[in-house]
Swiss-Prot record:
Origin superkingdom: Bacteria
Keywords noted in UniProt: Hydrolase, Periplasm, Signal
GO molecular function, one term: phosphatase activity
Gene3D superfamilies: Phosphoglycerate mutase-like
Family: Belongs to the phosphoglycerate mutase family. Ais subfamily.
Protein name per its UniProtKB record: Lipopolysaccharide core heptose(II)-phosphate phosphatase
Pathway assignment: Bacterial outer membrane biogenesis; lipopolysaccharide metabolism
Length: 200
């Protein structure tokens, strides 16, 4: 009897997971699977996901000044002028579908500048915990989400954080370029990775 109950619970768990993945894949015509195994989630699909539950979107910062020949915005530890333009373009596209979100960044010049240009005036909260890229980042995300359970969250962080999350949550190899992102959500105290954000 106990074995049957355990088997039944496992079956239900896998069924729920499969339903969730199917829902993500079927939410929009642009949704597909990346070569790294992550579902691709565009703006429209993200907006539909956000209707089901608040989403947490983590972006890598824009183009670094110290690793580019392009003109710097200001501080050499920050981003380039091209990076500001790219961040603003991404922010405009994102806000067209999801305008209501809380904005956070790690405490580096490049993430703060990226978030500022992305948001076009929205209040930015800097949180040094978002620079930590082990399990600590999950605790930070859950804490931020608990402060406003019904709000979407946008976080500007770093490539090694995104790489860690993709590997840890889905065993996927994710090497994000500038302003690439991941889509997550928090449910019953656990952080789930929904897929890779694709700006179309």
């Amino acid at each position: 009897m106990l074995a049957f109950c355990r088997s039944s619970l496992k079956s239900k768990k896998y069924f729920i997971i499969l339903l969730a993945l199917a829902a993500i894949a079927g939410l929009g015509t642009h949704a597909a699977w990346s070569s790294n195994g992550l579902p691709r989630i565009d703006n429209k699909t993200l907006a539909r996901l956000a209707q089901q539950h608040p989403v947490v979107v983590l972006f890598r910062h824009a183009e670094r000044c110290d690793r580019s020949t392009n003109q710097c915005l200001s501080d050499k530890t920050g981003i380039t002028v091209k990076g500001t333009q790219d961040a603003r373009e991404l922010g405009n596209a994102f806000s067209a579908d999801i305008s209501d979100f809380d904005l956070y960044s790690s405490n580096t010049v490049r993430t703060i500048q990226s978030a500022t240009w992305f948001s076009a005036g929205k209040k930015l909260t800097v949180d040094k915990r978002l620079l930590q890229c082990g399990n600590e980042i999950y605790s930070a995300i859950k804490d931020l989400q608990s402060k406003a359970p019904d709000k979407n969250i946008v976080i500007f962080t770093h490539n090694h954080c995104l790489t860690y999350i993709a590997k840890n949550k889905r065993d996927a190899i994710f090497k994000p370029d500038y302003l690439d992102g991941l889509v997550m959500h928090v449910e019953k105290g656990k952080v789930y990775l929904d897929g890779e954000f694709v700006n179309h």
